[in-house]
A protein has these predicted regions:
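N-terminal Rossmann-like dinucleotide-binding module
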Residues: 1-43
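Active-site loop of classical SDR/Rossmann-like NAD(P)-dependent oxidoreductases
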Residues: 15, 37-38, 277-292
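Active-site regions of enzymes building and remodeling cell-envelope glycoconjugates
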Residues: 42-54, 110-113
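Short amphipathic alpha-helix with an adjacent loop that forms part of the alpha/beta core around
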Residues: 52-64, 106-107
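C-terminal helix-rich "cap/oligomerization" subdomain common to oxidoreductases
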Residues: 65-72, 288-323
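Beta-strand-loop-alpha-helix segment that lines the small-molecule cofactor/substrate pocket
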Residues: 67-73, 77-122
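Predominantly a Rossmann-like dinucleotide-binding segment in NAD(P)-dependent oxidoreductases
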Residues: 122-192, 202
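Contiguous beta-strand/loop segments that form the cofactor/metal-binding neighborhood of enzyme cores
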Residues: 170-256, 292-298, 318-319
Length: 323
């Protein structure tokens, strides 16, 4: 089984470690961070190496038997990927939002790289897709809202390096790939409207970080994504409007800052305001199922094309959004 080097010691790194620790068969897990320390109390007992090459040399690791899992701000993604390439490490997992072109994959045909899209593995999304297929619902509009109070994290610059992170780069990447997955292949993808508002708390100002909204057209369907990072309300839901008065709402499980569950997930289907289906979810460990599939695939000889296609599809629309 391949060993794992997690790059980055923030919340994302901890969540990935937590998922890997649930696997029945997994190699050794290491952490590297250029700061050589960790601000995350949950991984205080782990040795933090200052670089990937130090991790390899100090532990006599074989680069062919390594998966590098990148959990850093996005500005650092390609620097770390290039380090991996120079060290002949071909198996990489990278957090969102990762953008790549076809030319990049042509240049590195042996590079197995997967972007974390954990909500694709959500029980809530699986149930929604199942109901759409079973009932042949025709989608007219998708609205997603991933909002939360991120004020303390933003003040402490979590998920940021030297460059400020814009609102569109935090929750909205999840919302984009979810809508694309539900809609399937579209011939036309157009940006109708986009807006980001600044983060202003006391004397702290972060440009285009506080609030974001995007309106997109996928063929004849409208998609609206919204994310407010300075609200006191925690919202993580998707609403799908279909023909004949059908509205599907998926509400994801909500957690507090210490990852304690505060609300179960739910899928509700209404028809002209009458509930025709309802199901509650007490468990939805989508990060575990995402990383489990990735780890198992990267331990096999070949990686499926679907993972590259997912990155290219995401890059096609997200690259235009952040221009």
């Amino acid at each position: 089984m391949k060993d794992i080097i997690i790059v980055g010691t923030s919340k994302a790194g901890f969540l990935h470690l937590k998922s890997y620790n649930k696997l029945s068969n997994v190699g050794k897990i290491f952490f590297t961070d250029i700061k050589e320390n960790t601000s995350n109390k949950n991984i205080k007992n782990k040795k933090i190496y200052k670089s990937i090459i130090d991790t390899l040399s100090q532990n006599n690791l074989n680069s062919n038997n390594i998966i590098v899992d990148i959990c850093t701000p996005k500005e650092e993604f390609y620097n770390i990927i290039n380090q991996c390439i120079s060290l002949d490490i071909n198996n990489i997992i990278v957090e969102k939002p990762f953008i790549a072109s076809k030319d990049f994959f042509y240049k590195y045909p042996n590079l197995n790289i997967l972007m974390v899209q954990n909500y694709l593995y959500s029980n809530i999304i699986s149930e929604i897709k199942k109901k759409i297929e079973e009932n042949n619902f025709n989608i007219r509009l998708i609205y997603t809202n991933f909002s939360k109070n991120r004020i303390n994290d933003s003040i402490n610059r979590r998920g940021m390096s030297k460059k400020n992170t814009r609102n569109f780069e935090i929750e909205i990447p999840h919302q984009i790939y979810l809508a694309e997955d539900i809609l399937g292949k579209s011939n036309k993808k157009e940006i109708v409207f986009k807006d980001q508002k600044d983060f202003i708390i006391d004397n702290i100002y972060i440009e285009k970080h506080g609030y974001g909204k995007i309106i997109l057209e996928y063929d004849d369907k409208l998609v609206i994504h919204e994310s407010d990072l300075v609200t006191n309300n925690t919202i993580k839901e998707i609403t799908i409007v279909c023909d004949e008065g059908v509205v599907i709402k998926g509400q994801f499980i909500l957690y507090d800052k210490d990852l304690n569950k505060i609300k179960n997930g739910k899928v509700i289907i209404n028809k002209y305001q009458n509930i025709i289906f309802q199901k509650e979810f007490e468990e939805d460990d989508n990060m575990y199922y995402c990383l489990k599939e990735y780890y198992e695939n990267l331990n096999n000889t070949g990686i499926q094309k679907k993972y590259r296609n997912r990155i290219l599809e995401f890059s096609n629309i997200f690259g235009r959004i952040i221009e």
